[in-house]
Amino acid sequence: MSGEQRKKEYLAKAREAEEHAQRTPDRHEKESWLRIAQSYRELAKGQ
C-alpha cells in the first residue's frame, strides 16, 4: 500500500471515529472516540 493510500485510509478511519463520537450520548465514550480520531489524524500526518 502506498503512503498516499495509507494516509487516505487513516483519514477515513478518523472520520468514522468522529461519527461514532457524535452518535454516543456518553461523555467518556465520546472523548475516547475523539482521541482515536486524533491518533489516526496524527498517523496520516506522519505519512
Region annotations inferred by a language model:
Residues 1-47:
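Terminal alpha-helical segments
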